[in-house]
């Protein structure tokens, strides 16, 4: 809200006016014309009289202001801007070379040069500069009237808040806001043109600047009435979407474009849009999404408010019908809530079942399960009432309340919203006013006044359902920058209602929304990005399509009757009287007035009178944005009912009225029919709920997806950088924008532009240009014309005391950098190397001066900061003023007493205490500091820095002082730049490795070594190389990227098959712990975090008496007096420290589409990723940097056809992170700050740390087994159509593989078995589990497979050696699946195994998992790799006939190759990827033979071998650096058909001669062209055969017999499960039967028919159809494997049949 009005009239300001006029520099308020029309009608206010004197005979209405501004023409080339071009080129060169991406230079160069020299762009730029100069001269000025000012051919006269613009004989009287709107439009167009030149240079279709210029010209020439003009502007974007869908939809039709009138109103624009559609649909969507460059309409207040008040009352349905439909919605809400609750907590919420409730619900509740049948039978839930699930949090955190919201103090104050002169003019009476306002008009002031000291008392009336009369008034405020001519309105309420709002919405957000799956309200922006990328991709694959719903005035449609039933249920869930129900009926008793200062309603005895335009007494809804969360829940409820009614599979994702529905295709109906039925049902149910769905404006598409202003075309985000960059403003909501805040705002806008784009380059290059333009407007010519000074200025960022700049914004590539200093030094190093800038100039600009004393407080708040003296920033000064102002105020409130404390001094004292840490670890200091009350106090002061708050908060701060303060800051920056003295010499720090330099620079400024802060700059630590010509040395430590196909420019905008990489999911290392019974307050959370950190330090072996003292003081100051130090589950460990964040989904700084074409992995960083130590590597940055390299090669015209790698280049950048111990050297002086937290915190005493005598490794393993089991059960129920990201239920992803390797997995697996036996699965759950494991799907199974990539773990895990002979497995995944299923395959053995776990561990709680893992880190040992054998040959061997791969086709080939290798006595063998992987695997098992695979940079073949191997042979015998570097062989090789040193096999035709060892030899072996004689080779004895080469079940007759019996009983169990496809299991069993028949000498049939089924509740598997109920299954292609022959020789007695079940014997014996 602006204060034009409030600061200008004496009658309305609380102190003598310091006449500051026009207090804004960019448009922040709605455009209203009422003051102008009042001025034209009456001449009662003195400045209105002055304004009327300036008007010409032809005066445009203020709403047509844009017609006049369109005619402004400037003389060409007024401003010299050559220096900007050269500086921009220099800056971009330096940035690009610092990142080692030099191939981008040319492309960026030409784009910047073209952008700043093209005459049209330049003219627009000069216009923008001219506007900004005027704005700078007239805003915040003491003179009321300024003028005339020239703007090209226009003259401007500023008279207080009014402006008269004149061209020739036409004038236009408008408000200052109208002028700002025109200035903003000029700025927006200037930015748009520059951004589009850069974008055009960087994408394959080439430049599209002409189209943009053409579009500007067409729009400026539209000569239509005001409303039609803005109708066109508003419909450009949706019309373009309609055009794209009309052309590119595949399975559904769309005539959305026909809704808009553009073709009739403006045919030129229509043809331009269609031309763009021809060129490229993405270009059309990108250009048309720019809506803020075409002026803003003035809001038509009378029509707008009349329509708004009408909508708040109109009734579509009768109240009775709404109430009954409300009850229907309540049933589905209960069903959805309980379903979500069960899947999250594995139990039902507390419920009360009414009489007549269905029996299936009772059963499900007792079992704590959810039956899928309830989805169809949701009506049953009308008999279920959910009881109390949580309490209302009655003491919301200050941070939630202290946003800068306007409130109206009480109902009596309504008259202060209007101008008295306007009332007199309209009604001819005086406006009666109280002598003063009854209270503050901003929330913050109410806080300072102590109105919020007792929130529960404020809310008490809502519990009773009786709201004070004084609170029942709402002001509807028009919203700014809206393209709707009739405007949108937001509510401004009284304090009590505002707080009620906060508490009710927070309760829903925290306790109800997380269980509902149909909205994105509780998702972080990163989680949402991941989700939308996934969704938009599924739509384009043809499996589903999307319906985008458009409700007409959604917010105004919710009637009290519809909400009453659900509100009653919410009151029961929170046990809070009438709290939620009060909210539904509140609008019926509230008076609404429209905020329009010059058009007041009539006042009758002090009350506003209803007139339907400016005032309404009692309506049916509260207006926009009030109960958003409740309404979102209701909307999704009726959508679910509608879609279930027509029986489709669907997902809903919605937030407010932005609802999208994804419908999956069905086998019986085509998509078009589904879409029409769905829309019909949705319309019907919306109507029942009293809403109107505009069906013709709902669109259906399978190529576009739009959600929350993000737009996707064919699964790829449409770059939003044009839209973002055209809206870059320098306004941050600051009271007075200063240089620092303007630049900071600009850099963060560039950041968000990059986030909306598929490449960071556009945002970076445009950002640099806009930054230079901003400096051009702000700084004097002396600085601007000095090119090297300007360049250096832009490359010195805040980390060494400079201004914020896009150049040091690595966040264009990554969001945030863990340590900005090395990057900053690398930039300056490159600057000196590549341009002619000298080091002394750098010293002059940086002026590094070490602060006179160490400022520990700044180190604690930002651990990466340097201790240097900087120019004092305005906000710090303003902050001091605020503190003083509040402290001197006379109020006695919690906040005032809080401010009277010496906050900053106490914070400095604590920081000084922490600085005695030896060694000095700033990250630990920061974590400790954050737990104190002082840190909390400082965070609250920061909230008070927002603009208007400050001014109104203290009568002492004048706007003028603030304005002067900003001027002072700018002047001191300018003085500093013009002053030629140099600061500290930076030369030594700009040479060599920046990681070391940064450490030294920190040491220099702080006087001590800082540990654990510096992180290397990624482009120095790793260098990109192509795999062509890469030597083996590069592969020693490398990250390898393999393109899916040859990548060219069109790959930058299409999706590949790899997952989209937006940064690793840096998983939470510790789950948020709950200390049960802790109240939900900020204090309690801080107590919890303190206890967690303390516990964490104990586990980390940091035991220091001073630290204990400090921790005790932290607890005491929060009112926690107990001595119990409970062991807690929780706290996240980031950078080796617990912090409060949840899982931080890492984010690259842009949408990294190219990553979907690249496979990459860090498995080949041998020294770092394989070790369990931690090193200074930020993997997320490294991975992103690799993708960025490919992106830049392609953008600069190259192609990527071969794999490439990032190899570790700077050895000093890798530093091992050592142990974390520290001590505090001195007794802490900090005594605590008790004044802050009002409620004492208690923790239930019964929690004690009983689990000390346990072995942490066993405890951790035991818990992990249970968590894996629970996650499996949740996975079974998850549907494949669920849109949320597939993560394990217990968040297992948070554990790193190196942590997992240190646990004894035999215990983990036994614990999992114990859990599965105890879980007593229902039939459908068992079937689900078996189906899921056989298909190898589900996040939990993927987690297990990731852990078991390490064969050593797999072999160590479970008593595999004892059990493997009983398991018939085919591959590693199959083995893991059967291992998990063992309790169902052979319950007897499993029970014996499980009983081995010591029963004392049953008391261990899996909630403490993280602490056990942390403790196990130091004691656990990694299992050693061991290599098992294959059968080997020697010249004089002893025949035993045991051959590897005995089941496979290539077994003989493999034996011959092994003989050749031994005959030739080879030490090194090259193998090409064309060789059968099984043979290669066998060769890897030969001892004393080094294998080199000819990979040529692509590790896929090696990974295949690793996956097949079940011991450590492949990983230990393949020389991986040489394999990756090898493109051809240099020695003996297997694979090619010819060439020197090639061993090849020739299959013999008919004559197979005997061989002493192999019965018949199928191959002759040749080396080059010579025959190798292998006739004398014979077997070596075999001790430990590898399970991958010799199936354990065929190893002896005994093991085969056991496996056969196990498998038989398992198949019989499976037959009992309804709805499970038995075929694959039967085929597996049949493999064993064939071998059994061969052993018994039975004839083996090629094809067999089985009859399967359940007869009299018993399973039947027979070869004869003796009952009609049996199902027939045919198994063909049967042949015994070669191992069978060996077993047959072994079984001469026929002992196989002894003791077999009769049914099994019948299957074996063929009659």
From Swiss-Prot:
Its EC number is 2.7.7.48. It is an enzyme of class 2 (transferase). It is found in: Virion; Host nucleus. Interacts with the P protein. Residues 543-715 form the RdRp catalytic domain. One of its GO terms (molecular function) is RNA-directed RNA polymerase activity. It catalyses: RNA(n) + a ribonucleoside 5'-triphosphate = RNA(n+1) + diphosphate. One of its GO terms (cellular component) is host cell nucleus. A motif (Nuclear localization signal) lies at residues 844-852. Its main location: virion. Displays RNA-directed RNA polymerase activity. The mRNA guanylyl transferase and mRNA (guanine-N(7)-)-methyltransferase activities are supposedly provided by cellular enzymes. The template is composed of the viral RNA tightly encapsidated by the nucleoprotein (N). Functions either as transcriptase or as replicase. The transcriptase synthesizes subsequently three subgenomic RNAs, assuring their capping and polyadenylation by a stuttering mechanism. In replicase mode, the polymerase replicates the whole viral genome without recognizing the transcriptional signals. This is RNA-directed RNA polymerase L. The lineage of its organism: Viruses, Riboviria, Orthornavirae, Negarnaviricota, Haploviricotina. It comes from Borna disease virus (strain V) (BDV). Pfam families: Mononeg_mRNAcap, Mononeg_RNA_pol.
């Amino acid at each position: 809200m602006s204060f034009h009005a409030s600061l200008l009239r004496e009658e309305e300001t609380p102190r003598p006016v310091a006449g500051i006029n026009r207090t804004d520099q960019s448009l922040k308020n709605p455009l209203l014309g009422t003051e102008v029309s009042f001025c034209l009608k009456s001449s009662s206010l003195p400045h209105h009289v002055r304004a009327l004197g300036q008007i010409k005979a032809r005066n445009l209405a203020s709403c047509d202001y844009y017609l006049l501004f369109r005619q402004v023409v400037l003389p060409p080339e007024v401003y010299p801007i050559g220096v900007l071009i050269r500086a921009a080129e220099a800056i971009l060169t330096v940035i690009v070379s610092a990142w080692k991406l030099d191939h981008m230079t040319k492309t960026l160069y030409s784009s910047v040069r073209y952008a700043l020299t093209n005459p049209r762009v330049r003219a627009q730029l000069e216009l923008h500069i001219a506007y900004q100069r005027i704005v700078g001269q007239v805003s915040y000025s003491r003179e009321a009237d300024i003028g005339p000012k020239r703007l090209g051919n226009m003259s401007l006269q500023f008279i207080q808040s009014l402006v008269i613009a004149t061209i020739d004989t036409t004038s236009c009287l408008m408000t200052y806001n109208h002028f700002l709107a025109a200035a903003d439009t000029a700025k927006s167009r200037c930015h748009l043109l520059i951004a589009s030149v850069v974008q055009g240079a960087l994408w394959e279709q080439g430049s599209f600047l002409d189209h943009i210029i053409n579009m500007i010209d067409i729009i400026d020439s539209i000569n239509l009435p005001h409303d039609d003009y803005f109708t066109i502007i508003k419909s450009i974007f949706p019309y373009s979407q309609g055009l794209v869908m009309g052309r590119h939809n595949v399975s559904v039709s769309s005539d959305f474009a026909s809704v808009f009138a553009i073709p009739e109103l403006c045919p030129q624009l229509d043809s331009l849009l269609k031309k763009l559609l021809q060129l490229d649909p993405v270009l059309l969507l990108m250009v048309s999404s720019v809506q803020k460059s075409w002026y803003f309409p003035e809001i038509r207040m009378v029509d707008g408010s009349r329509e708004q008040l009408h909508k708040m009352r109109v009734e579509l349905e009768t109240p009775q019908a709404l109430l009954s439909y409300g009850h229907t919605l309540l049933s589905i809400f209960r069903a959805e809530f309980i379903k979500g609750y069960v899947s999250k907590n594995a139990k039902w919420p507390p419920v009360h079942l009414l009489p007549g409730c269905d029996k299936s619900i009772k059963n499900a509740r007792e079992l704590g399960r959810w039956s899928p049948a309830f989805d169809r039978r949701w009506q049953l839930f009308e008999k279920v009432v959910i009881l109390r699930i949580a309490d209302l949090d009655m003491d919301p955190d200050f941070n939630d309340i202290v946003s800068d919201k306007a409130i109206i103090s009480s109902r009596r104050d309504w008259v202060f919203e209007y101008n008295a002169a306007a009332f007199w003019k309209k009604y001819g009476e005086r406006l009666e006013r109280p002598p003063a306002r009854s209270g503050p008009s901003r929330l913050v002031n109410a806080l300072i006044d102590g109105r919020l000291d007792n929130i529960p008392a404020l809310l008490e009336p809502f519990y009773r359902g009786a709201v004070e009369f004084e609170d029942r008034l709402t002001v509807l405020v028009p919203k700014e920058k809206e393209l709707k001519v009739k405007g949108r309105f937001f509510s401004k309420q009284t304090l009590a209602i505002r707080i009620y709002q906060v508490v009710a919405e927070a309760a829903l957000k925290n306790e109800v929304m997380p269980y509902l799956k149909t909205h994105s309200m509780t998702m972080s922006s990163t989680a949402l990005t991941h989700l939308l990328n996934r969704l938009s991709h599924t739509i384009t694959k043809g499996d589903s399509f999307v319906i985008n719903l458009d409700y007409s005035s959604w917010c105004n449609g919710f009637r009290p009757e519809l909400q009453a039933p659900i509100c009653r249920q919410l009151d029961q869930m929170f046990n809070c009287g009438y709290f939620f129900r009060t909210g539904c009926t509140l609008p019926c008793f509230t008076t609404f007035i429209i905020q329009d200062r010059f058009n007041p309603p009539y006042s009758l005895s002090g009350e506003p009178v209803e007139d339907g335009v400016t005032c309404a007494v009692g309506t049916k809804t509260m207006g926009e944005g009030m109960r958003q969360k409740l309404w979102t829940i209701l909307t999704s409820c009726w959508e679910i009912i509608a879609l279930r009614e027509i029986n489709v599979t669907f997902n809903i994702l919605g937030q407010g009225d932005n609802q999208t529905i994804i419908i999956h295709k069905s086998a019986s109906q085509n998509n078009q029919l589904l879409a029409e039925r769905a829309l019909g049902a949705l319309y019907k149910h919306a109507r029942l709920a009293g809403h109107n769905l505009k069906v013709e404006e709902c669109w259906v598409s399978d190529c576009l997806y739009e959600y929350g202003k993000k737009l996707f075309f064919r699964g790829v985000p449409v770059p939003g950088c044009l839209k973002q960059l055209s809206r870059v403003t320098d306004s941050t909501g600051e009271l007075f924008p200063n240089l620092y805040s303007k630049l900071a705002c600009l850099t963060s806008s560039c950041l968000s532009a990059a986030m909306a784009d598929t490449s960071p380059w556009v945002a970076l290059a445009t950002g640099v240009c806009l930054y230079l333009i901003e400096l051009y407007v702000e700084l004097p010519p002396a600085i601007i014309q000095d090119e090297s000074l300007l360049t250096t200025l832009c490359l010195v960022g805040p980390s060494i005391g400079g201004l914020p700049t896009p150049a040091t914004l690595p966040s264009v590539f990554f969001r945030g950098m863990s340590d900005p200093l090395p990057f900053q030094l690398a930039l300056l190093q490159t600057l000196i190397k590549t341009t002619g800038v000298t080091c002394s100039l750098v010293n002059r600009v940086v002026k590094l001066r070490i602060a006179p004393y160490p400022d520990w407080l700044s180190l604690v708040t930002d651990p990466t900061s340097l201790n240097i003296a900087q120019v004092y920033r305005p906000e710090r000064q303003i902050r001091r003023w605020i503190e003083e102002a509040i402290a001197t105020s006379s109020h006695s409130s919690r906040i005032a007493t809080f401010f009277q404390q010496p906050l900053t001094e106490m914070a400095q004292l604590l920081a000084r205490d922490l600085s005695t840490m030896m060694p000095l670890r700033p990250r630990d200091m920061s974590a400790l500091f954050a737990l104190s009350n002082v840190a909390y106090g400082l965070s609250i002061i920061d909230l008070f820095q927002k603009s208007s708050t400050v001014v109104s908060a203290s009568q002492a701060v004048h706007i003028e002082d603030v304005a002067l303060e900003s001027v002072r800051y700018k002047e001191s920056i300018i003085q500093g730049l013009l002053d030629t003295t140099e600061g500290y010499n930076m030369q030594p720090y700009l040479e060599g490795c920046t990681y070391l330099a940064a450490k030294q620079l920190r040491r220099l400024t702080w006087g001590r070594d800082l540990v654990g802060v510096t992180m290397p700059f990624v482009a120095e630590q790793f260098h990109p190389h192509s795999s062509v010509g890469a030597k083996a040395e590069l592969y020693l430590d490398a990250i390898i990227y393999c393109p899916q196909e040859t990548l060219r420019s069109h790959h930058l905008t299409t999706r590949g098959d790899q997952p989209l990489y937006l940064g690793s999911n840096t998983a939470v290392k510790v789950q948020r712990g709950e200390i049960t019974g802790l109240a939900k307050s900020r204090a309690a959370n801080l107590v919890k975090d303190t206890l967690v950190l303390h516990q964490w330090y104990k586990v980390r072996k940091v035991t220091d008496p001073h630290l204990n003292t400090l921790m005790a003081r932290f607890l005491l100051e929060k009112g926690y007096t107990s001595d119990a130090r409970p062991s807690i589950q929780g706290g996240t460990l980031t950078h080796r420290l617990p912090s409060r964040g949840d899982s931080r989904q890492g984010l690259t700084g842009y949408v990294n589409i190219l990553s979907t074409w690249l496979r990459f992995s860090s498995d080949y960083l041998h020294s770092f990723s394989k070790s369990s130590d931690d090193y200074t590597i930020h993997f997320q940055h490294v991975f992103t940097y690799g993708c960025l390299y490919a992106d830049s090669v392609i953008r600069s015209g190259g192609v990527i056809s071969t794999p490439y790698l990032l190899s570790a280049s700077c050895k000093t950048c890798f530093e091992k992170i050592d142990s974390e111990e520290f001590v505090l050297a001195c007794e802490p002086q900090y005594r605590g700050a008790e004044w802050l937290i009002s409620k004492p915190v208690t923790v239930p005493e019964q929690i004690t740390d009983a689990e000390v005598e346990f072995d942490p490794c066993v405890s951790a393993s035991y818990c992990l087994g249970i968590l894996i089991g629970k996650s499996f059960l949740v996975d079974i129920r998850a549907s494949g159509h669920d849109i949320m990201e597939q993560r394990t239920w217990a968040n297992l992803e948070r554990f790193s593989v190196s942590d997992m390797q240190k646990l004894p997995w035999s215990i983990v697996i036994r614990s999992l078995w114990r859990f599965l036996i105890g879980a007593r699965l229902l039939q459908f759950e068992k079937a689900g589990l078996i189906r899921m494991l056989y298909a190898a799907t589900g996040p939990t199974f993927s987690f297990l497979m990731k852990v078991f990539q390490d064969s050593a773990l797999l072999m160590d895990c479970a008593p595999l050696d004892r059990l493997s002979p009983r398991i018939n497995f085919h591959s590693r995944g199959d083995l893991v699946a059967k291992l998990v299923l063992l309790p169902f395959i052979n319950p007897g053995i499993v029970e014996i195994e499980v009983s081995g776990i010591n029963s004392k561990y049953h008391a261990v709680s899996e909630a403490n998992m993280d602490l056990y893992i942390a403790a196990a880190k130091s004691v656990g040992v990694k299992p050693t790799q061991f290599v098992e054998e294959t059968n080997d040959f020697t010249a004089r061997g002893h025949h035993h006939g045991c051959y590897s791969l005995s089941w496979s086709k290539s077994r003989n080939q493999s034996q011959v190759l092994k003989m050749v290798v031994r005959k030739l006595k080879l030490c090194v063998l090259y193998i090409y990827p064309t060789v059968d992987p099984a043979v290669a695997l066998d060769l890897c098992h030969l001892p004393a033979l080094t294998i080199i695979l000819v990979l040529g940079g692509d590790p896929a073949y090696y990974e295949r071998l690793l996956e097949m191997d079940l011991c450590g042979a492949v990983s230990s015998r393949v020389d991986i650096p040489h394999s990756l570097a090898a493109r051809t062989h240099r020695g003996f090789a297997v694979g090619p058909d010819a060439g020197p040193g090639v061993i090849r096999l020739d299959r013999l035709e008919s004559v197979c001669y005997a061989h002493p060892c192999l019965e018949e030899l199928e191959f002759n072996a040749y080396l080059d062209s010579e025959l190798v004689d292998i006739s004398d080779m014979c077997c070596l004895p075999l001790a430990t055969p590898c399970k991958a080469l010799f199936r354990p079940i065929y190893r002896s007759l005994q093991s085969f017999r056991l496996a056969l019996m196990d498998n038989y009983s398992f198949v019989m169990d499976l037959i009992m499960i309804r709805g499970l496809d038995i075929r694959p299991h039967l085929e597996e069993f049949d493999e064993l039967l064939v071998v059994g028949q061969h052993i018994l000498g039975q004839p083996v049939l090629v094809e067999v028919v089985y009859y399967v089924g359940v007869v009299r509740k018993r399973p039947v598997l027979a070869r004869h159809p003796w009952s009609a109920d049996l199902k027939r299954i045919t198994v063909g292609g049967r042949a015994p494997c070669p191992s069978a022959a060996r077993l047959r020789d072994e079984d001469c007695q026929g002992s196989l049949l002894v003791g077999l079940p009769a049914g099994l014997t019948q299957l074996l014996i063929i009659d």
